[in-house]
Swiss-Prot record:
UniProt modified residues of type Phosphotyrosine: 781
Cofactor note: Binds 1 zinc ion per subunit. Binds 1 Cl(-) ion per subunit.
Region of interest called Essential for cleavage by TMPRSS11D and TMPRSS2, as start-end residue ranges on this chain: 697-716
N-terminal signal peptide: 1-17
Motif (PTB): 792-795
Gene name, Swiss-Prot/TrEMBL: ACE2
Summary of the function given for this chain in its UniProt record: Essential counter-regulatory carboxypeptidase of the renin-angiotensin hormone system that is a critical regulator of blood volume, systemic vascular resistance, and thus cardiovascular homeostasis. Converts angiotensin I to angiotensin 1-9, a nine-amino acid peptide with anti-hypertrophic effects in cardiomyocytes, and angiotensin II to angiotensin 1-7, which then acts as a beneficial vasodilator and anti-proliferation agent, counterbalancing the actions of the vasoconstrictor angiotensin II.
Motif (PDZ-binding): 803-805
Entry PTM: Proteolytic cleavage by ADAM17 generates a secreted form. Also cleaved by serine proteases: TMPRSS2, TMPRSS11D and HPN/TMPRSS1.
Protein name: Angiotensin-converting enzyme 2
Length: 805
């Protein structure tokens, strides 16, 4: 048989083997899809029941259903390993196997897997049920939604906002801290067992594309793209930041620095994530009709149902389908109030089996009107790819899923669209001033959040990678917040806090970079869809409603789900394979030009040194080595606790004896910041149970003077080695060393005297010997005057010579 015949037979055999493996894999996946549909639905339904009615029974039901689903996935993942990916040619089959071969959390031992589920459920419950009570009336308590969020959205009272901001983090963040520490360890273990560097790397894997010619994309490339696009966005953000700072100075003149960072609790919501609610304080041309249509919605008696029906009309107008009847029957669109505890954070649900729902405690505001479009965008995506195999029913990447609803929000927010649905009056006229008002409102929501998103995820990536030690989480968090976002903590937070976990997405295990990538995608999509809609004019004026051409272009991409690489899906819509910030910058170009003109006489950027509590802070410097030498002790958290307790004692004593007031200051009321390794820090004091009431520095100084010696004694230091900068040393005796100083001085003086006497004695003896020797060697005839008959002493009787003293 010829060589070519052998080669042909070999190729046939290999093809047959591959065909057999692929056929077996297809059969396996068909069986998996059928079984997964039922188990996933039961698990999702149990999770929905818990999120809409938080009870112990529903927690247990959710855990049981989740355990069954996890066990099934673990078993199927093991079976999927039997099919080598390199021998699979069919891309659809290959992608499904690739997804299933990822073990996820099932790679952990049974005990660790259960512990991780318990941690996740507990964090979710703490977040959703956390409440803050009035210190003066413990029966008056507020949940995050609507109570605390209402304060953070609308209050102009600096101290009330500070109370809400700090109390949420103190009550919820501190509870979450030990759980989040465990979560990081277990998630990292899971990720590494799945062949990722850490959990952040595991999350970035959602963007990875391998083996698809020129459409490949690496996890490292995501980091590079995010960083370089952020640098392009920074100039616009810095000018927005400077403009907002100037307006906040008008509202809070004694609390803002004209060159400093923005206090975190003044930025429109609990986290400073979206600055939308700052619009009323920052509107450039207030005499123009208000483009925030909240009042119009209230006046026209809109409710949650109307809001979502209007969102549905928008999607239908571009050729996308209506919501299903089951959607309207099963969704929870309003807060049930005291009837049951619910997770109020807006979420869209694809439970499987054609069951799509939204959970949202909708309020009648323009912000929630746009949020409804966002959440319904998720549902449209879910419905579009429902025909895909189970494992490919997802967005091309997580950012795509978030972007779909945001595209619609860009159009729904335009004055043109708001006029068309009766929320702006028919005689509303657009001009340069209304254009700037509109773009500023959009920028507060869109541009203002980008550094927040980037910094949060960068911090988490560093934590998962081990680049931030656990005992420096909060220190690094606020350093990065100052440097990257230009936002400062209104009060210092130590390592008992867990401020990142006070955000829903962190405590509920969502990756966050999706909200950064989605923002870039949404403007790329918007530009492409506006072209399909034959829009002419600036991008920010485009409204794609009623354009079925734009809708069809979008729908073609949505239907792909995860069956094609996201780079290919992006290219199909926008003509490019990568993220591009240009459409976003084009959209905001008129605003950027206006902001630069407005900021001509303002400082653009921020100093990271300033803090809102600086004026009332006292700096402390401690010199342990110079004071105690080899007996110096280590300065650690226990010493800080002792210091805070000592100051609290001084405050109690001062207020009782000088002001005749019994105020029970505690160590938690002494706030320490800027702790440096060479032992220096700042502190200030707040009233018990009221962080917004800072005790004036002058009062604290008086209390310190009054108890200075007691504080010194607690640390075995004196006024020179325990310095309160700005407070003069007291007249009280310093801390006595083990041996009295006068004894030491006396001993030194006596030693010097004795040494002096000894030196004198030996010097005298030495000099006498020298003189005698000189006398003996002198020529006896040298000075004789012979004419005078001088006596020759050499012949005199030596007995007459007296010994010299």
């Amino acid at each position: 048989m010829s060589g070519s015949s052998w080669l042909l037979l070999s190729l046939v055999a290999v093809t047959a083997a591959q065909s057999t493996i692929e056929e077996q894999a297809k059969t396996f996946l068909d069986k998996f899809n059928h079984e997964a549909e039922d188990l996933f639905y039961q698990s999702s339904l149990a999770s929905w029941n818990y999120n809409t009615n938080i009870t112990e029974e529903n927690v247990q039901n959710m855990n049981n259903a989740g355990d069954k689903w996890s066990a099934f996935l673990k078993e199927q993942s093991t079976l999927a390993q039997m099919y080598p990916l390199q021998e699979i040619q069919n891309l659809t089959v290959k992608l499904q196997l690739q997804a299933l071969q990822q073990n996820g959390s099932s790679v952990l031992s049974e005990d660790k897997s259960k512990r991780l589920n318990t941690i996740l459920n507990t964090m979710s419950t703490i977040y959703s049920t956390g409440k803050v009570c009035n210190p003066n009336n413990p029966q008056e308590c507020l949940l995050l939604e609507p109570g605390l969020n209402e304060i953070m959205a609308n209050s102009l009272d600096y101290n009330e906002r500070l109370w809400a901001w700090e109390s949420w983090r103190s009550e919820v963040g501190k509870q979450l801290r030990p759980l989040y520490e465990e979560y990081v360890v277990l998630k990292n273990e899971m990720a590494r067992a799945n062949h990722y560097e850490d959990y952040g790397d595991y999350w970035r894997g959602d963007y990875e594309v391998n083996g698809v010619d020129s459409y490949d994309y690496s996890r490292g490339q995501l980091i590079e793209d995010v960083e370089h696009t952020f640098e392009e966005i920074k100039p616009l953000y810095e000018h927005l930041h400077a403009y907002v700072r100037a307006k906040l100075i008008n509202a809070y003149p004694s609390y803002i620095s004209p060159i400093g960072c923005l206090p975190a609790h003044l930025l429109g919501d609990m986290w400073g994530r979206f600055w939308t609610n700052l619009y009323s304080l920052t509107v450039p041309f207030g005499q123009k009709p208000n483009i925030d249509v909240t009042d119009a919605m209230v006046d026209q008696a809109w409710d949650a149902q109307r809001i979502f029906k209007e969102a549905e009309k928008f999607f239908v107008s571009v050729g996308l389908p209506n919501m299903t009847q089951r959607f309207w029957e099963n969704s929870m669109l309003t807060d049930p109030g005291n009837v049951q505890k619910v997770v109020c954070h807006p979420t869209a649900w694809d439970l499987g089996k054609g069951d799509f729902r939204i959970l949202m405690c909708t309020k009648v505001t323009m912000d929630d009107f746009l949020t409804a479009h966002h959440e319904m965008g998720h549902i449209q995506y879910d419905m579009a790819y429902a025909a895909q195999p189970f494992l490919l029913r997802n967005g091309a990447n997580e950012g795509f899923h978030e972007a779909v609803g945001e595209i619609m929000s860009l159009s729904a927010a335009t004055p043109k669209h708001l006029k068309s649905i009766g929320l702006l009056s028919p005689d509303f006229q657009e001009d340069n001033e209304t254009e700037i008002n509109f773009l500023l409102k959009q920028a507060l929501t869109i541009v203002g959040t980008l550094p927040f998103t980037y910094m949060l995820e960068k911090w988490r990536w560093m934590v998962f990678k081990g680049e931030i030690p656990k005992d420096q989480w909060m220190k690094k968090w606020w350093e990065m917040k100052r440097e990257i976002v230009g936002v400062v903590e209104p009060v210092p937070h130590d390592e008992t806090y867990c401020d990142p976990a006070s955000l829903f997405h962190v405590s509920n295990d969502y990756s966050f970079i999706r909200y950064y990538t989605r923002t870039l995608y949404q403007f790329q999509f918007q530009e492409a869809l506006c072209q399909a809609a034959k829009h002419e004019g600036p991008l920010h004026k485009c409204d794609i409603s009623n354009s079925t051409e734009a809708g069809q272009k979008l729908l073609n991409m949505l239907r792909l789900g995860k069956s094609e690489p996201w780079t290919l899906a992006l290219e199909n819509v926008v003509g490019a394979k990568n993220m591009n910030v240009r459409p976003l910058l084009d959209y905001f170009e008129p605003l950027f030009t206006w902001l630069k003109d407005q900021n001509k006489n303002s400082f653009v950027g921020w100093s990271t040194d300033w803090s809102p509590y600086a004026d009332q802070s006292i700096k402390v410097r401690i010199s342990l080595k110079s004071a105690l030498g080899n007996k110096a002790y280590e300065w650690n958290d226990n010493e800080i606790y002792l210091f805070r307790s000592s100051v609290a004692y001084a405050m109690r004593k001062y207020f009782l004896e000088v002001k005749n007031q019994m105020i029970l200051f505690g160590e938690e009321d002494v706030r320490v910041a800027n702790l440096k390794p060479r032992i220096s820090f700042n502190f200030f004091v707040t009233a018990p149970k009221n962080v917004s009431d800072i005790i004036p520095r002058t009062e604290v100084e008086k209390a310190i003077r009054m108890s200075r010696s007691r504080i010194n004694d607690a640390f075995r230091l004196n006024d020179n080695s325990l310095e309160f900068l700005g407070i003069q040393p007291t007249l009280g005796p310093p801390n006595q060393p083990p041996v009295s100083i006068w004894l030491i001085v006396f001993g030194v003086v006596m030693g010097v005297i004795v040494v002096g006497i000894v030196v004198l004695i030996f010097t005298g003896i030495r000099d006498r010997k020298k003189k005698n020797k000189a006398r003996n060697e002198e020529n006896p005839y040298a000075s004789i005057d012979i004419s005078k008959g001088e006596n020759n002493p050499g012949f005199q009787n030596t007995d007459d010579v007296q010994t010299s003293f």
